[in-house]
Structure formats: structure tokens, C-alpha cells
């Protein structure tokens, strides 16, 4: 899997984790569900299903407007993060971290934005 370096550490993107999952389990399922959505805050759950068996879950929370990307895409960002975490819990792309490159990049951006305030 292709790695991205962020602040000196290697991370795997969610898209790379999904591609690897599809290679390993072409009939596997990645199911997502909104668990809560109110006042600009959203919580997603992602489930990884292999051969009809739930093998991993992941959750992610985002707040609308809490970062540059979340001003317009907090729903998509939360769903992507939940998928990345679920695939990580399944063991895909976790050589250096359970967090995906997407999550870490967003966190770094958020820290920079918070510092500007």
C-alpha cells in the first residue's frame, strides 16, 4: 500500500485501505450509518463485514465548521474517517498507526487553524 509521510511518520490513506480490503475480500461489505446528527455535529459508524460476519467497527465524530474542510464537508469527512478506523481495526494499513493519513492531515490542519486564533 502506498504511504504518505506526515510530520516524519508514514500513514496510509483511507482510499488505500479500501483498495486493499477490496483485493482481499471482493465480496466483503463496508457499511456506514449515521448514529447521531444534530446541531452541526455528526457521528458515523462503519462496519466491516466478511463472509456475512461483522469483523470490525469504527466510529468518527465531526463538527460542522470546526476546520476548513468541515465548513463544507463534515458529513463526508466523518464517514471517511469511520471507514478508515474500521478498516484499521480489521488490521488493514496499521503498520505505523491506527489513524489514517486523512485523519492525521485533518488534525494537523485543525491545530494550525486553532493556533491562528
Which residues are covered by each model-predicted region?
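Polyanion-binding surfaces on beta-sheet-dominated domains and ring/shell assemblies
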Residues: 1-117
Amino acid at each position: 500500500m502506498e504511504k504518505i509521510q506526515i510530520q516524519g511518520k508514514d500513514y496510509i490513506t483511507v482510499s488505500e485501505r479500501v483498495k486493499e480490503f477490496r483485493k482481499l475480500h471482493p465480496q466483503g461489505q463496508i457499511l456506514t450509518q449515521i448514529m447521531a446528527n444534530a446541531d452541526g455535529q455528526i457521528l458515523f459508524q462503519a462496519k466491516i463485514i466478511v463472509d456475512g460476519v461483522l469483523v470490525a467497527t469504527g466510529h468518527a465524530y465531526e463538527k460542522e465548521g470546526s476546520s476548513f474542510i468541515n465548513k463544507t464537508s463534515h458529513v463526508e469527512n466523518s464517514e471517511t474517517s469511520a471507514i478508515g478506523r474500521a478498516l484499521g481495526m480489521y488490521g488493514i494499513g496499521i503498520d505505523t498507526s491506527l489513524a489514517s493519513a486523512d485523519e492525521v492531515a485533518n488534525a494537523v490542519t485543525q491545530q494550525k487553524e486553532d493556533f491562528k486564533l
